[in-house]
Amino acid sequence: MSEPSRGRWLLPAVAGGTFGAMLTALVLLVAAPQWLGPRMVREGLLADPQVLADAADALRDRQTAPLLASHRAALETPFASSWKGAEKPDVVLVEFFDYACGYCKASLPHVEQLLREDKGLRVVYREFPILGPDSVAAARVSLAASKAGRFKQYHDALYQAGRPGPQTIAAAARAANLPAAVSDSADIEAELKRNFQIASQLGASGTPTFVVGNRVLHGAVGYAELKKAIADARRKS
């Protein structure tokens, strides 16, 4: 089964999302006060279609804000050293990722560019291994590396080594100079379980999934969309 164009979707998705928000926004616009009339609504949308996108964004933010607020601390507090960027950030981008996900790898240069450009940004990485046993093995070693203060080194080394498997995971661990860390400890298993629970509650059905401010972005949305979401989160904070 081929991967979709922006991300890998394997878990049941919850109702709603961007399409649902846009549909609701369209209904609200079409059901505008009668004095506008359908012709004026249509002409307004044709003249400035961004109005519909803005309405969808506003509606989506109102719907997700309470849910994200209840998980904010858990989302933005990294496990050990599983983060990059600002020591004292003014905005946090959370990425649910899987080392075996090609779209996560494709998003890597966009995230790295944002980190280089934005000195107030922190990226928190949440292990979300949904693509099989090798993904789970890679995530466990990644969390062990995080506990040893070597997350960045292992993270970058494994992406450079290729798709996770016994050989590439071992090579990345060596490249990161990892000690003989235990990768199946209780705190590692608890972290994986917690990530899956939060992802499910947020409707994160695949990787990558990004969370920033009151936005949940599904798939490899690209540099421009991530930058816009970060700017929006900073403006509304």
Where are these regions (language model features)?
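Cysteine-centric redox/oxidoreductase cores and disulfide-bonded domains
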Residues: 129-207, 211-237
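Extracytoplasmic thiol/disulfide redox context detector
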Residues: 2-133, 184-201, 206, 228, ...
